C-alpha cells in the first residue's frame, strides 16, 4: 500500500476479472466471450474507420444510437452509449443512486455491483437468493435507493420472466430499477418492451457477448429520455469521447448484420443445450441457464480441484471463491470442437485410468 494513495484508493476492493492468458493453445471458457469472430462486414467497417483515426469520434454517437433505437422501435433519445457496459453501469450508479439510500441487489450476482457501491459510497441491502438460486421478487419491492440485477442473472444464468420484472417496477415507482441484460440475446424477452411504460426503468446491454465485440468495448443503456440525459451529464463530466471510431463502426455493422447475429446466437444456444445434456450424463448438477454459460457442480469432484485440473490440461473455466459458489464452476459456451475437448478432459479427470 503506497503512502501516496488517497483514502479511497486504500479502501476499495477492485473487481477481479477472469484470467486472460497470452497463449493461443489455451481454450478460454472462463469469461463468457463469444467463441465466434465478428462477421466480415464488421471487420471491413472497422478497417474503413481506421482511415480517419486522426479525427475525434462523435461525442454524441448519433448514428449508433439511431441503429440501436431502430432495433427496438425507439427514438435515439432513449439510448446512451458507453465504453463497455461496465462503464455504463458505473455512470448509472453515479446518476441514479444516492449515498445514504440503500440499493437492493442479489447476494449472488455480478461482482462489479458491490465494487461500485463501495467506490461511490452507496449503501446496500443485499438480498439472498431462494434455495433454487432464483431471485425472490417480493424482496426487491419498496427499495430506499433503487434496484439493480442482471437478467439472466450472472453467474447463475437463471432468467426472470418479464411479468416479474414488471412487479418490481410497479413496487418501486420512485426509484430507478436497472436491469443488466448482458446475456439477453441468449434468453427470452428483453425488458426493453417495458421502457415506454415505466419511466423508472433502465436497461443496460453490451456488444461483448452476442455481437462478438468484447475487444472493442461497447455498452449501451435504454430508458426514458430523462434518464439518458442524466447519464450524459455524468459522462460529459468525465470524458466527452468515451467511445472510439473503431468501436462505433464495428457496433453499427454488427447490428446491421442480422443474419450473422442470428446464426451465431443460435449455434451458441444449441451448444448450450448439448453441453448441458452431456454434463448431466456425467453426474453434474446444472442450473437452468439462459445465458452463454452454465453454472455447474459435480456430485463427487470438488469444484476447485476440477478447475485446477482443467487448467493444467489447457482449459480455463471460472471458479469463484465466494460463499454460495464454492462448489460451482461457470463454463462459457464454446464452439462444438472446444466443447468436445472439454468433455474429453472432464472424463479424464472424473474417470481416471486404473
From Swiss-Prot:
User: Which reaction equations make up its catalytic activity?
Assistant: L-histidinol phosphate + 2-oxoglutarate = 3-(imidazol-4-yl)-2-oxopropyl phosphate + L-glutamate
**Biological or metabolic pathway of the protein:** Amino-acid biosynthesis; L-histidine biosynthesis; L-histidine from 5-phospho-alpha-D-ribose 1-diphosphate: step 7/9
Record keywords: Amino-acid biosynthesis, Aminotransferase, Histidine biosynthesis, Pyridoxal phosphate, Transferase
N-terminal signal peptide: none
Q: Which PROSITE patterns match?
A: AA_TRANSFER_CLASS_2
**Required co-factors:** pyridoxal 5'-phosphate
Q: What is its EC number?
A: 2.6.1.9
Is the keyword Protease in the record?
Answer: no
Supply the name of the protein: Histidinol-phosphate aminotransferase 1
Q: Which organism is it from?
A: Oceanobacillus iheyensis (strain DSM 14371 / CIP 107618 / JCM 11309 / KCTC 3954 / HTE831)
Amino acid at each position: 500500500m503506497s503512502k501516496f494513495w488517497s483514502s479511497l484508493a486504500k479502501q476499495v476492493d477492485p473487481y477481479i476479472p477472469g484470467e486472460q492468458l497470452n497463449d493461443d493453445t489455451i481454450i478460454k471458457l472462463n469469461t463468457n466471450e463469444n467463441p465466434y469472430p465478428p462477421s466480415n462486414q464488421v471487420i471491413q467497417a472497422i478497417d474503413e474507420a481506421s482511415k480517419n483515426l486522426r479525427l475525434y469520434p462523435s461525442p454524441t454517437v448519433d448514428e449508433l444510437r439511431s441503429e440501436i433505437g431502430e432495433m427496438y422501435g425507439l427514438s435515439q433519445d432513449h439510448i446512451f452509449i458507453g465504453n463497455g457496459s461496465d462503464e455504463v453501469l458505473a455512470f448509472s450508479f453515479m446518476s441514479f443512486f444516492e449515498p445514504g439510500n440503500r440499493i437492493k441487489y442479489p447476494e449472488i450476482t455480478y461482482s462489479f455491483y458491490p465494487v461500485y457501491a463501495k467506490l461511490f459510497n452507496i449503501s446496500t441491502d443485499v438480498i439472498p437468493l431462494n434455495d433454487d438460486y432464483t431471485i425472490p421478487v417480493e424482496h426487491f419491492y419498496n427499495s430506499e435507493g433503487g434496484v439493480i440485477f442482471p437478467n439472466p442473472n450472472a453467474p447463475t444464468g437463471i432468467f426472470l420472466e418479464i411479468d416479474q420484472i414488471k412487479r418490481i417496477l410497479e413496487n418501486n415507482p420512485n426509484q430507478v430499477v436497472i436491469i443488466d441484460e448482458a446475456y439477453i440475446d441468449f434468453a427470452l424477452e428483453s425488458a426493453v418492451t417495458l421502457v415506454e411504460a415505466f419511466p423508472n426503468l433502465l436497461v443496460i446491454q453490451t456488444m461483448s457477448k452476442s455481437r462478438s465485440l468484447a475487444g472493442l468495448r461497447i455498452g449501451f443503456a435504454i430508458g426514458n429520455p430523462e434518464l439518458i440525459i442524466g447519464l450524459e451529464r455524468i459522462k460529459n463530466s468525465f470524458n466527452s469521447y468515451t467511445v472510439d471510431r473503431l468501436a462505433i463502426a464495428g457496433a453499427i455493422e454488427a447490428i446491421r448484420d442480422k443474419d450473422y447475429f442470428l446464426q451465431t446466437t443460435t449455434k451458441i444456444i444449441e451448444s448450450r443445450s448439448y453441453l448441458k445434456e452431456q454434463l448431466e450424463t456425467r453426474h453434474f448438477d446444472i442450473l437452468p441457464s439462459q445465458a452463454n454459460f452454465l453454472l455447474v457442480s459435480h456430485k463427487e469432484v470438488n469444484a476447485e480441484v476440477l478447475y485446477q485440473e482443467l487448467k493444467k490440461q489447457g482449459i480455463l473455466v471460472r471458479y469463484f471463491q465466494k460463499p454460495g459458489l464454492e462448489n460451482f464452476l461457470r463454463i462459457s459456451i464454446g464452439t462444438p470442437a472446444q466443447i468436445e475437448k472439454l468433455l474429453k478432459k472432464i472424463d479424464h479427470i472424473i474417470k481416471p485410468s486404473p
